[in-house]
């Protein structure tokens, strides 16, 4: 089976910047939703390097996927004199939380740059938030595009390998979808479009739409209940699935779709434990597994024929935009200078 990575640069994803310029010299505080996210780890490494290149001292703080922790840490940073606050919001899409943080930062008259995780489910509402403070900005991607591209990739792959993937020869492809977080806007979009866009490709070619493996699951996905997009969640789910849905029972899950590569890794580990998707792909059945982020671990799995495909987001592009806008706001320059 052909394995591939589709690359999506931040610009191609529609890098969006919503902006509302300077503070005293000091430390720039960057509050991360979690240090445990593999993609965000690559953004953090790139952002630290980009800020250092601009002569800025950065303090990175892990919120451990806890909004109260993030709020408390940001308030502490403001009291201790941060010259700017950069926020990777824990509660994605929670406008009330974003407003609370924005007001606290605005009160200290220092720049506020939110990035990556949406501040609202409504673009107009988000725009109004940033219009309300001239020293603020949002840097992010069009959160629908990774899911759309993943879905198209899946549809094209399944169409090309339909008979090979259809293990029980029932003329349908059964799948499982692993969702990273119930409320996160990117997770919602990837869960929706990862299947819908695949179905569009398949049905246009006269093939049936994908079929969720468990007809009793109305949501048609399994979510990480901790909201951390983790390989632990997908591993546990996949282990449980394989005990009931397998080739011996004639109902094997034939396709695995994941919101990110870390969840894909967990699913692959469970499959490997059951004798599927072994390194090299020889002498075993390989269940197609798709993710998002094109992490180093995912690229290695693809090279080893254990994983099928991933969508790459541009961590460096995201980091450069955040660093440039933050440094410009601190220096009192036009926030877009250098972009």
Give the ranges of each region predicted by the language model.
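Sec-dependent N-terminal signal peptides of Gram-positive bacterial secreted proteins and lipoproteins
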Residues: 4-24
């Amino acid at each position: 089976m052909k394995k591939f990575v589709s690359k999506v640069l931040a610009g191609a994803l529609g890098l969006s910047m919503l902006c509302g310029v300077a503070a005293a010299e000091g430390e720039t505080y960057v509050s991360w939703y979690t240090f445990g996210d593999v993609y965000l780890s690559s953004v953090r490494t790139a952002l630290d390097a980009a800020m250092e290149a601009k002569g800025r001292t950065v303090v990175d703080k892990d919120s451990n996927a806890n909004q109260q922790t993030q709020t408390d840490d940001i308030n502490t940073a403001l009291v201790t004199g941060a010259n700017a606050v950069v926020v990777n919001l824990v509660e994605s899409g929670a406008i009330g939380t974003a407003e609370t943080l924005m007001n606290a930062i605005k009160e200290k008259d220092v720049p506020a740059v939110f990035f990556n995780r949406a501040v609202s489910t409504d673009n107009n509402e988000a725009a109004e938030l940033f219009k309300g403070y001239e020293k603020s900005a949002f840097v992010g991607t069009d959160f629908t595009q990774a899911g759309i591209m993943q879905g198209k990739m899946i549809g094209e792959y399944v169409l090309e390998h339909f008979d090979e993937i259809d293990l029980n020869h029932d003329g349908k492809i059964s799948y499982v979808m692993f969702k990273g977080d119930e409320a996160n806007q990117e997770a919602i979009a990837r869960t929706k479009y990862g299947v819908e866009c695949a179905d569009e490709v398949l049905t246009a070619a006269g093939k049936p739409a994908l079929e969720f493996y468990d007809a009793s699951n109305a949501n048609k996905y399994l979510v990480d209940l901790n909201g951390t997009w983790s390989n632990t969640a997908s591993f546990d789910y996949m282990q449980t699935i394989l005990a009931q849905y397998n080739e011996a029972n004639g109902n094997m899950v034939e396709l695995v779709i994941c919101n990110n590569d870390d969840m894909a890794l967990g699913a692959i580990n469970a499959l490997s434990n059951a004798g599927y998707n072994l390194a090299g792909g020889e002498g075993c059945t390989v269940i197609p597994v798709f993710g998002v982020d094109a992490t180093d671990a995912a690229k290695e799995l693809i090279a080893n024929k254990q994983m099928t495909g991933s969508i790459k987001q541009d961590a460096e592009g995201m980091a450069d935009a955040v660093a440039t806008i933050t440094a410009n706001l601190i220096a009192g320059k036009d926030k877009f200078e250098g972009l």
